[in-house]
Amino acid sequence: MIDDKLRNCFDEMVVYKDLKKSNFFNALSLPSFMRDWILKKFEDEEGNFDADQVAKFVRTYLPKKEDWNSIKNRVVVEQERVKFLAKVSVYIEIKTGEVSFSLPDFGLSFKDTIIEDHVWQECKDDLIGQQETWGMVELGYRAPDDFDWTFEYEKRKTKTKDGKQGKIKLVSFKTFCPYRTDLDYFKDARNEFTIDEWIDILLGAVDYNAEGYGGDEEKKLTMLTRLLPFIEKRLNLVELAPKGTGKSYLYGRVSRYGWLSSGGIMSRAKMFYDQSKHTEGLVAGNDFITLDEVQTISFTDVDEMRAALKGYLESGIYTVGNHEGTADAGMILCGNIRKEIMDADGYSNMFEELPKVFHESALIDRFHGFIKGWNIPRMNDDLKVAGWALNSEYFCSIMHELRNDMSYRAVVDEMIQVPEAADTRDTEAIKRIATAYLKLLFPNVREPGDISVREFKRYCLDRARKMRDTIKYQLGILDVEYQGKDIPNFTINTEYEQ
Protein backbone atom coordinates (compact mmCIF):
# COMPACT_ATOMS: atom_id res chain seq x y z
CA MET A 1 0.00 0.00 0.00
CA ILE A 2 1.32 3.44 -0.94
CA ASP A 3 0.72 4.91 2.56
CA ASP A 4 2.96 2.27 4.14
CA LYS A 5 5.63 2.73 1.48
CA LEU A 6 5.50 6.50 1.91
CA ARG A 7 5.87 6.28 5.70
CA ASN A 8 8.69 3.75 5.42
CA CYS A 9 10.63 5.90 2.97
CA PHE A 10 10.09 9.34 4.47
CA ASP A 11 9.27 8.52 8.10
CA GLU A 12 9.58 11.84 9.99
CA MET A 13 8.66 13.88 6.91
CA VAL A 14 5.13 12.43 6.72
CA VAL A 15 2.06 13.74 8.56
CA TYR A 16 -1.57 12.70 8.67
CA LYS A 17 -3.67 15.34 6.92
CA ASP A 18 -7.45 15.32 6.84
CA LEU A 19 -8.68 18.51 5.24
CA LYS A 20 -12.13 17.04 4.72
CA LYS A 21 -13.02 17.26 8.40
CA SER A 22 -10.26 19.36 9.97
CA ASN A 23 -12.51 22.38 10.47
CA PHE A 24 -10.36 23.02 13.52
CA PHE A 25 -7.42 24.06 11.32
CA ASN A 26 -9.65 25.85 8.83
CA ALA A 27 -10.82 28.09 11.66
CA LEU A 28 -7.21 28.90 12.55
CA SER A 29 -6.55 30.05 8.96
CA LEU A 30 -2.96 28.82 8.98
CA PRO A 31 -0.81 28.42 5.87
CA SER A 32 -0.10 24.78 4.98
CA PHE A 33 3.55 24.84 6.01
CA MET A 34 2.63 26.13 9.48
CA ARG A 35 -0.27 23.70 9.87
CA ASP A 36 1.91 20.70 8.99
CA TRP A 37 4.66 21.87 11.35
CA ILE A 38 2.13 21.98 14.19
CA LEU A 39 0.64 18.62 13.19
CA LYS A 40 4.08 17.03 13.31
CA LYS A 41 4.69 18.55 16.72
CA PHE A 42 1.47 17.22 18.28
CA GLU A 43 0.40 14.11 16.31
CA ASP A 44 0.94 10.60 17.62
CA GLU A 45 1.91 7.64 15.44
CA GLU A 46 -1.70 7.15 14.37
CA GLY A 47 -2.12 10.76 13.28
CA ASN A 48 -4.24 11.80 16.27
CA PHE A 49 -3.71 15.03 18.20
CA ASP A 50 -5.16 16.81 21.22
CA ALA A 51 -7.11 19.79 19.88
CA ASP A 52 -6.90 21.60 23.23
CA GLN A 53 -3.11 21.32 23.26
CA VAL A 54 -2.87 22.63 19.72
CA ALA A 55 -5.28 25.47 20.43
CA LYS A 56 -3.24 26.51 23.48
CA PHE A 57 -0.02 26.49 21.43
CA VAL A 58 -1.61 28.57 18.68
CA ARG A 59 -3.00 31.09 21.18
CA THR A 60 0.42 31.41 22.82
CA TYR A 61 2.77 31.46 19.85
CA LEU A 62 0.70 32.51 16.83
CA PRO A 63 -0.82 35.87 17.72
CA LYS A 64 -3.19 37.65 15.37
CA LYS A 65 -2.78 41.21 14.15
CA GLU A 66 -5.31 42.43 16.67
CA ASP A 67 -3.11 41.03 19.48
CA TRP A 68 -0.25 43.39 18.63
CA ASN A 69 -1.23 46.16 21.09
CA SER A 70 -1.32 43.59 23.87
CA ILE A 71 2.14 42.35 22.89
CA LYS A 72 3.49 45.92 22.80
CA ASN A 73 2.10 46.55 26.25
CA ARG A 74 3.80 43.44 27.63
CA VAL A 75 7.12 44.31 25.99
CA VAL A 76 7.27 48.10 26.41
CA VAL A 77 5.22 48.85 29.53
CA GLU A 78 5.40 45.63 31.52
CA GLN A 79 9.04 45.05 30.46
CA GLU A 80 8.37 41.37 29.68
CA ARG A 81 10.12 39.22 27.13
CA VAL A 82 7.62 37.75 24.67
CA LYS A 83 8.12 34.80 22.31
CA PHE A 84 6.01 34.02 19.25
CA LEU A 85 6.25 32.79 15.65
CA ALA A 86 6.49 35.56 13.07
CA LYS A 87 7.88 36.60 9.72
CA VAL A 88 10.99 38.79 10.13
CA SER A 89 12.85 41.12 7.78
CA VAL A 90 16.15 42.83 8.63
CA TYR A 91 17.61 46.18 7.62
CA ILE A 92 21.24 47.30 7.90
CA GLU A 93 21.75 51.07 8.07
CA ILE A 94 24.80 51.85 5.96
CA LYS A 95 25.63 55.19 7.64
CA THR A 96 25.67 53.90 11.21
CA GLY A 97 26.07 50.13 10.84
CA GLU A 98 23.02 49.68 13.06
CA VAL A 99 20.88 46.59 12.41
CA SER A 100 17.12 46.69 12.86
CA PHE A 101 14.21 44.42 11.98
CA SER A 102 10.56 44.58 11.03
CA LEU A 103 7.57 42.32 11.61
CA PRO A 104 5.54 43.04 8.45
CA ASP A 105 2.47 41.11 9.58
CA PHE A 106 2.13 43.35 12.65
CA GLY A 107 3.16 46.69 11.17
CA LEU A 108 6.33 46.97 13.29
CA SER A 109 8.82 48.95 11.21
CA PHE A 110 12.63 49.18 11.16
CA LYS A 111 12.68 52.63 12.77
CA ASP A 112 11.17 51.29 16.01
CA THR A 113 13.51 48.32 16.48
CA ILE A 114 17.11 47.34 17.13
CA ILE A 115 19.17 44.14 16.97
CA GLU A 116 22.09 44.53 19.35
CA ASP A 117 25.47 43.32 18.17
CA HIS A 118 25.78 40.21 20.35
CA VAL A 119 22.33 39.02 19.23
CA TRP A 120 23.13 39.78 15.59
CA GLN A 121 26.29 37.68 15.75
CA GLU A 122 24.25 34.73 17.03
CA CYS A 123 21.38 34.83 14.54
CA LYS A 124 22.61 36.70 11.44
CA ASP A 125 23.14 33.53 9.39
CA ASP A 126 19.45 32.66 9.79
CA LEU A 127 18.23 36.18 9.07
CA ILE A 128 20.19 37.24 6.00
CA GLY A 129 19.45 34.24 3.77
CA GLN A 130 16.12 35.63 2.59
CA GLN A 131 14.32 38.94 2.47
CA GLU A 132 11.81 37.59 4.99
CA THR A 133 12.35 34.66 7.35
CA TRP A 134 9.86 32.72 9.46
CA GLY A 135 10.97 31.93 12.98
CA MET A 136 10.45 32.09 16.73
CA VAL A 137 11.19 35.66 17.80
CA GLU A 138 11.80 36.79 21.36
CA LEU A 139 11.19 40.49 21.89
CA GLY A 140 12.34 42.80 24.67
CA TYR A 141 12.57 46.54 25.20
CA ARG A 142 15.56 48.88 25.19
CA ALA A 143 14.55 51.97 27.14
CA PRO A 144 15.78 55.45 26.17
CA ASP A 145 19.19 56.39 27.52
CA ASP A 146 18.36 58.73 30.41
CA PHE A 147 21.74 60.42 30.11
CA ASP A 148 21.65 61.19 26.41
CA TRP A 149 20.09 64.64 26.46
CA THR A 150 20.30 67.67 24.24
CA PHE A 151 18.75 70.89 25.30
CA GLU A 152 17.13 73.47 23.15
CA TYR A 153 16.58 76.71 25.02
CA GLU A 154 13.79 78.83 23.69
CA LYS A 155 12.43 82.10 24.98
CA ARG A 156 10.50 80.25 27.66
CA LYS A 157 13.66 78.26 28.46
CA THR A 158 11.91 74.94 27.91
CA LYS A 159 14.03 71.90 27.23
CA THR A 160 13.28 69.09 24.84
CA LYS A 161 14.69 65.61 24.78
CA ASP A 162 16.26 64.56 21.51
CA GLY A 163 18.41 61.58 22.46
CA LYS A 164 18.15 57.85 21.98
CA GLN A 165 14.61 56.66 21.50
CA GLY A 166 13.15 53.60 23.15
CA LYS A 167 13.12 50.62 20.80
CA ILE A 168 11.82 47.08 20.69
CA LYS A 169 14.83 44.77 20.54
CA LEU A 170 15.28 41.26 19.24
CA VAL A 171 16.48 39.15 22.16
CA SER A 172 16.72 35.85 20.29
CA PHE A 173 15.65 34.21 17.04
CA LYS A 174 15.26 30.58 16.06
CA THR A 175 14.57 29.93 12.40
CA PHE A 176 11.44 28.08 11.42
CA CYS A 177 13.14 25.15 9.73
CA PRO A 178 12.07 21.94 11.43
CA TYR A 179 13.90 19.67 8.99
CA ARG A 180 17.30 19.27 7.46
CA THR A 181 16.60 18.93 3.76
CA ASP A 182 18.76 16.03 2.62
CA LEU A 183 18.42 16.34 -1.15
CA ASP A 184 20.30 13.15 -1.95
CA TYR A 185 17.98 11.15 0.31
CA PHE A 186 14.92 12.70 -1.35
CA LYS A 187 16.29 11.93 -4.82
CA ASP A 188 17.09 8.33 -3.95
CA ALA A 189 13.70 7.78 -2.32
CA ARG A 190 12.03 8.53 -5.66
CA ASN A 191 13.43 5.21 -6.94
CA GLU A 192 11.01 3.36 -4.65
CA PHE A 193 7.90 4.64 -6.45
CA THR A 194 6.36 4.31 -9.90
CA ILE A 195 5.57 7.50 -11.81
CA ASP A 196 1.84 7.08 -11.02
CA GLU A 197 2.56 6.67 -7.31
CA TRP A 198 4.90 9.66 -7.33
CA ILE A 199 2.33 11.92 -8.99
CA ASP A 200 -0.14 10.99 -6.23
CA ILE A 201 2.48 11.68 -3.55
CA LEU A 202 3.18 15.14 -4.98
CA LEU A 203 -0.53 15.96 -4.91
CA GLY A 204 -0.75 14.92 -1.27
CA ALA A 205 2.27 17.05 -0.42
CA VAL A 206 0.33 20.15 -1.50
CA ASP A 207 -2.93 19.07 0.21
CA TYR A 208 -4.76 17.36 -2.67
CA ASN A 209 -6.33 13.91 -2.71
CA ALA A 210 -5.19 12.05 -5.83
CA GLU A 211 -8.23 9.76 -5.77
CA GLY A 212 -10.47 12.78 -6.27
CA TYR A 213 -9.19 13.11 -9.85
CA GLY A 214 -10.77 9.79 -10.83
CA GLY A 215 -7.58 8.47 -12.43
CA ASP A 216 -7.38 11.39 -14.90
CA GLU A 217 -3.63 11.85 -15.34
CA GLU A 218 -3.97 15.02 -17.41
CA LYS A 219 -5.91 16.78 -14.67
CA LYS A 220 -3.36 15.69 -12.07
CA LEU A 221 -0.41 16.87 -14.15
CA THR A 222 -2.05 20.19 -14.98
CA MET A 223 -2.49 20.81 -11.26
CA LEU A 224 1.16 19.91 -10.60
CA THR A 225 2.28 22.22 -13.41
CA ARG A 226 1.52 25.06 -11.02
CA LEU A 227 4.53 23.91 -8.97
CA LEU A 228 7.08 24.39 -11.76
CA PRO A 229 8.07 27.95 -10.69
CA PHE A 230 8.55 26.62 -7.13
CA ILE A 231 11.33 24.34 -8.34
CA GLU A 232 13.00 26.14 -11.28
CA LYS A 233 14.51 29.62 -11.21
CA ARG A 234 12.99 32.42 -13.27
CA LEU A 235 10.27 30.31 -14.82
CA ASN A 236 7.54 32.65 -16.04
CA LEU A 237 4.03 31.30 -16.63
CA VAL A 238 0.52 32.51 -17.45
CA GLU A 239 -2.51 30.66 -16.10
CA LEU A 240 -6.11 31.43 -16.92
CA ALA A 241 -8.67 29.27 -15.15
CA PRO A 242 -12.28 29.22 -13.97
CA LYS A 243 -13.02 30.47 -10.47
CA GLY A 244 -12.65 28.01 -7.62
CA THR A 245 -9.81 25.84 -9.00
CA GLY A 246 -7.46 26.61 -6.10
CA LYS A 247 -5.04 29.08 -7.72
CA SER A 248 -4.87 31.39 -4.71
CA TYR A 249 -4.51 28.50 -2.26
CA LEU A 250 -1.64 26.78 -4.01
CA TYR A 251 0.35 29.92 -4.82
CA GLY A 252 -0.40 31.75 -1.59
CA ARG A 253 -0.86 29.23 1.24
CA VAL A 254 1.35 26.22 0.57
CA SER A 255 4.91 27.58 0.40
CA ARG A 256 6.66 30.23 2.49
CA TYR A 257 9.04 30.99 -0.39
CA GLY A 258 6.58 32.78 -2.66
CA TRP A 259 4.49 35.93 -2.75
CA LEU A 260 0.85 36.19 -3.83
CA SER A 261 -0.45 39.60 -4.83
CA SER A 262 -4.21 39.62 -5.31
CA GLY A 263 -5.66 42.73 -6.90
CA GLY A 264 -4.80 46.27 -5.84
CA ILE A 265 -1.96 48.47 -7.02
CA MET A 266 1.49 47.28 -8.12
CA SER A 267 4.40 49.65 -8.69
CA ARG A 268 7.93 49.27 -10.00
CA ALA A 269 9.18 50.24 -6.53
CA LYS A 270 7.25 47.43 -4.85
CA MET A 271 8.17 44.84 -7.45
CA PHE A 272 11.84 45.71 -8.06
CA TYR A 273 13.48 48.51 -6.06
CA ASP A 274 12.29 51.48 -4.00
CA GLN A 275 14.65 54.39 -4.60
CA SER A 276 13.25 56.50 -1.78
CA LYS A 277 13.68 53.77 0.84
CA HIS A 278 16.74 52.11 -0.75
CA THR A 279 15.09 48.72 -0.34
CA GLU A 280 14.80 45.75 -2.69
CA GLY A 281 11.40 44.73 -4.00
CA LEU A 282 9.47 41.48 -4.12
CA VAL A 283 11.61 39.77 -6.76
CA ALA A 284 14.69 39.92 -4.55
CA GLY A 285 13.30 37.96 -1.64
CA ASN A 286 11.00 35.32 -3.13
CA ASP A 287 11.20 32.23 -5.33
CA PHE A 288 8.14 33.30 -7.30
CA ILE A 289 5.72 36.22 -7.52
CA THR A 290 2.10 35.45 -8.39
CA LEU A 291 -0.08 38.26 -9.69
CA ASP A 292 -3.46 36.73 -8.90
CA GLU A 293 -6.74 38.20 -10.13
CA VAL A 294 -4.48 39.99 -12.59
CA GLN A 295 -7.44 41.68 -14.29
CA THR A 296 -8.02 43.67 -11.09
CA ILE A 297 -4.40 44.80 -10.61
CA SER A 298 -3.59 48.36 -11.62
CA PHE A 299 -0.07 49.63 -12.29
CA THR A 300 1.04 53.08 -11.19
CA ASP A 301 2.92 53.70 -14.46
CA VAL A 302 2.17 51.24 -17.26
CA ASP A 303 5.13 52.13 -19.52
CA GLU A 304 7.58 52.14 -16.62
CA MET A 305 6.36 48.77 -15.37
CA ARG A 306 6.34 47.21 -18.84
CA ALA A 307 9.96 48.27 -19.46
CA ALA A 308 11.08 46.93 -16.08
CA LEU A 309 9.25 43.63 -16.61
CA LYS A 310 10.69 43.11 -20.10
CA GLY A 311 14.23 43.54 -18.85
CA TYR A 312 13.75 41.34 -15.81
CA LEU A 313 11.84 38.51 -17.50
CA GLU A 314 14.52 38.32 -20.18
CA SER A 315 17.65 38.30 -18.04
CA GLY A 316 16.82 38.42 -14.34
CA ILE A 317 18.35 41.90 -14.20
CA TYR A 318 16.45 45.06 -13.26
CA THR A 319 17.60 48.67 -13.31
CA VAL A 320 15.90 51.42 -11.33
CA GLY A 321 17.67 54.77 -11.52
CA ASN A 322 21.31 54.09 -10.73
CA HIS A 323 20.53 50.81 -9.01
CA GLU A 324 21.03 47.51 -10.83
CA GLY A 325 19.93 44.26 -9.24
CA THR A 326 19.56 40.59 -10.09
CA ALA A 327 17.03 38.06 -8.85
CA ASP A 328 15.80 34.51 -9.50
CA ALA A 329 12.07 34.87 -8.83
CA GLY A 330 9.70 33.51 -11.43
CA MET A 331 6.63 35.49 -12.48
CA ILE A 332 3.15 33.97 -12.68
CA LEU A 333 0.12 35.76 -14.10
CA CYS A 334 -3.18 34.29 -12.89
CA GLY A 335 -6.62 35.30 -14.01
CA ASN A 336 -10.15 34.01 -14.38
CA ILE A 337 -11.50 33.12 -17.80
CA ARG A 338 -14.94 33.14 -19.42
CA LYS A 339 -16.61 29.91 -20.57
CA GLU A 340 -16.58 30.84 -24.27
CA ILE A 341 -12.81 31.39 -24.09
CA MET A 342 -12.32 28.04 -22.36
CA ASP A 343 -14.40 26.28 -25.00
CA ALA A 344 -11.98 27.52 -27.67
CA ASP A 345 -9.18 25.65 -25.81
CA GLY A 346 -6.54 28.31 -26.38
CA TYR A 347 -7.42 29.23 -29.95
CA SER A 348 -9.11 32.58 -29.27
CA ASN A 349 -7.74 35.82 -27.84
CA MET A 350 -7.22 34.94 -24.18
CA PHE A 351 -5.18 37.99 -23.23
CA GLU A 352 -7.69 40.69 -24.17
CA GLU A 353 -8.91 41.02 -20.58
CA LEU A 354 -5.43 41.33 -19.08
CA PRO A 355 -4.21 44.78 -17.95
CA LYS A 356 -2.81 47.00 -20.71
CA VAL A 357 0.73 46.46 -19.50
CA PHE A 358 0.51 42.91 -20.94
CA HIS A 359 -0.95 43.92 -24.31
CA GLU A 360 2.44 43.80 -25.98
CA SER A 361 3.85 40.79 -27.81
CA ALA A 362 7.45 41.51 -26.79
CA LEU A 363 6.44 41.17 -23.13
CA ILE A 364 4.24 38.09 -23.52
CA ASP A 365 7.02 36.39 -25.53
CA ARG A 366 9.11 36.45 -22.35
CA PHE A 367 6.62 34.20 -20.56
CA HIS A 368 7.76 30.64 -21.10
CA GLY A 369 4.50 28.72 -21.02
CA PHE A 370 0.75 28.70 -20.51
CA ILE A 371 -1.27 26.62 -18.03
CA LYS A 372 -4.74 25.67 -19.26
CA GLY A 373 -6.42 26.05 -15.91
CA TRP A 374 -9.74 24.80 -17.28
CA ASN A 375 -8.23 21.30 -17.21
CA ILE A 376 -8.13 21.55 -13.40
CA PRO A 377 -11.39 20.54 -11.68
CA ARG A 378 -13.17 23.00 -9.44
CA MET A 379 -12.29 22.44 -5.78
CA ASN A 380 -14.55 20.00 -3.94
CA ASP A 381 -14.34 17.87 -0.80
CA ASP A 382 -13.18 14.79 -2.74
CA LEU A 383 -10.07 16.70 -3.83
CA LYS A 384 -9.02 17.51 -0.25
CA VAL A 385 -6.32 15.25 1.15
CA ALA A 386 -7.39 12.73 3.78
CA GLY A 387 -4.52 10.44 4.72
CA TRP A 388 -0.77 10.24 5.18
CA ALA A 389 1.14 12.70 3.03
CA LEU A 390 4.47 14.47 2.74
CA ASN A 391 4.74 17.43 5.07
CA SER A 392 4.12 20.59 3.00
CA GLU A 393 6.90 22.50 4.76
CA TYR A 394 9.41 19.73 4.06
CA PHE A 395 8.36 19.36 0.43
CA CYS A 396 8.45 23.10 -0.26
CA SER A 397 11.91 23.30 1.32
CA ILE A 398 13.05 20.50 -1.00
CA MET A 399 11.68 22.36 -4.04
CA HIS A 400 13.43 25.52 -2.84
CA GLU A 401 16.76 23.66 -2.61
CA LEU A 402 16.31 21.98 -6.00
CA ARG A 403 16.23 25.40 -7.67
CA ASN A 404 20.01 25.54 -7.26
CA ASP A 405 20.68 22.10 -8.75
CA MET A 406 21.96 22.60 -12.31
CA SER A 407 22.47 18.90 -13.06
CA TYR A 408 18.91 18.53 -14.37
CA ARG A 409 19.40 21.26 -16.96
CA ALA A 410 22.56 19.47 -18.10
CA VAL A 411 20.49 16.30 -18.68
CA VAL A 412 17.88 18.28 -20.63
CA ASP A 413 20.54 20.01 -22.75
CA GLU A 414 22.02 16.63 -23.62
CA MET A 415 18.76 14.85 -24.41
CA ILE A 416 16.95 17.50 -26.48
CA GLN A 417 17.93 17.96 -30.11
CA VAL A 418 17.51 21.62 -31.06
CA PRO A 419 16.73 22.16 -34.78
CA GLU A 420 18.74 24.62 -36.86
CA ALA A 421 17.79 28.30 -36.64
CA ALA A 422 15.45 27.62 -33.73
CA ASP A 423 14.08 30.73 -32.05
CA THR A 424 16.20 31.43 -28.97
CA ARG A 425 13.27 32.24 -26.70
CA ASP A 426 11.38 29.11 -27.78
CA THR A 427 14.45 26.99 -27.08
CA GLU A 428 15.01 28.49 -23.64
CA ALA A 429 11.32 28.24 -22.73
CA ILE A 430 11.03 24.58 -23.65
CA LYS A 431 14.27 23.62 -21.96
CA ARG A 432 13.40 25.52 -18.80
CA ILE A 433 9.93 23.96 -18.52
CA ALA A 434 11.28 20.48 -19.32
CA THR A 435 13.94 20.94 -16.62
CA ALA A 436 11.29 21.87 -14.07
CA TYR A 437 9.20 18.80 -14.94
CA LEU A 438 12.29 16.60 -14.66
CA LYS A 439 13.06 17.95 -11.18
CA LEU A 440 9.47 17.54 -10.04
CA LEU A 441 8.58 14.14 -11.49
CA PHE A 442 12.00 12.45 -11.74
CA PRO A 443 14.28 13.95 -9.05
CA ASN A 444 16.25 10.67 -9.02
CA VAL A 445 17.67 11.37 -12.51
CA ARG A 446 21.34 12.30 -12.39
CA GLU A 447 22.30 11.54 -16.00
CA PRO A 448 20.43 10.83 -19.26
CA GLY A 449 20.57 7.07 -18.81
CA ASP A 450 18.52 7.30 -15.60
CA ILE A 451 15.26 8.03 -17.45
CA SER A 452 13.67 6.25 -20.39
CA VAL A 453 13.26 8.21 -23.62
CA ARG A 454 9.54 7.44 -23.55
CA GLU A 455 9.05 8.95 -20.09
CA PHE A 456 11.24 11.98 -20.79
CA LYS A 457 9.35 12.71 -23.99
CA ARG A 458 5.91 12.14 -22.49
CA TYR A 459 6.30 13.91 -19.17
CA CYS A 460 8.91 16.59 -19.91
CA LEU A 461 9.48 17.49 -23.58
CA ASP A 462 5.95 17.09 -24.98
CA ARG A 463 4.35 18.94 -22.09
CA ALA A 464 6.88 21.77 -22.41
CA ARG A 465 6.15 22.02 -26.15
CA LYS A 466 2.40 22.27 -25.56
CA MET A 467 2.80 24.98 -22.92
CA ARG A 468 5.03 27.07 -25.18
CA ASP A 469 2.84 26.43 -28.21
CA THR A 470 -0.12 28.17 -26.55
CA ILE A 471 2.01 31.26 -25.86
CA LYS A 472 3.19 31.23 -29.48
CA TYR A 473 -0.37 31.04 -30.83
CA GLN A 474 -1.48 33.92 -28.62
CA LEU A 475 1.47 35.98 -29.86
CA GLY A 476 0.12 35.52 -33.38
CA ILE A 477 -3.21 36.99 -32.26
CA LEU A 478 -1.51 39.95 -30.57
CA ASP A 479 0.97 40.74 -33.34
CA VAL A 480 0.93 39.91 -37.09
CA GLU A 481 4.70 39.48 -36.95
CA TYR A 482 4.19 36.20 -35.06
CA GLN A 483 1.35 34.82 -37.17
CA GLY A 484 2.05 31.42 -38.71
CA LYS A 485 5.27 30.96 -36.74
CA ASP A 486 5.11 27.63 -34.97
CA ILE A 487 7.62 26.52 -32.37
CA PRO A 488 10.52 24.47 -33.80
CA ASN A 489 10.29 20.69 -33.86
CA PHE A 490 12.37 19.77 -30.81
CA THR A 491 13.17 16.07 -30.71
CA ILE A 492 15.19 13.61 -28.65
CA ASN A 493 18.90 13.39 -29.44
CA THR A 494 19.35 10.38 -31.74
CA GLU A 495 22.03 8.98 -29.43
CA TYR A 496 19.37 8.37 -26.79
CA GLU A 497 16.58 7.38 -29.19
CA GLN A 498 18.61 4.29 -29.93
Describe each PLM feature range.
Residues 339-357, 381-389:
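Conserved P-loop NTPase catalytic core
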Residues 325, 330-334, 350-380:
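Long, well-ordered mid-to-C-terminal structural blocks that present hydrophobic/aromatic surfaces
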Residues 197-215, 404-421:
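Short amphipathic alpha-helical segments and their helix-coil junctions
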Residues 1-209:
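Extended, charged/polar low-complexity intrinsically disordered regions
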Residues 60, 363-364, 368-498:
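Conserved NTP phosphate-binding and transfer environment spanning the P-loop NTPase/kinase superfamily
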Residues 211-343, 347-349, 365, 488-493:
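Conserved ASCE/P-loop NTPase catalytic core
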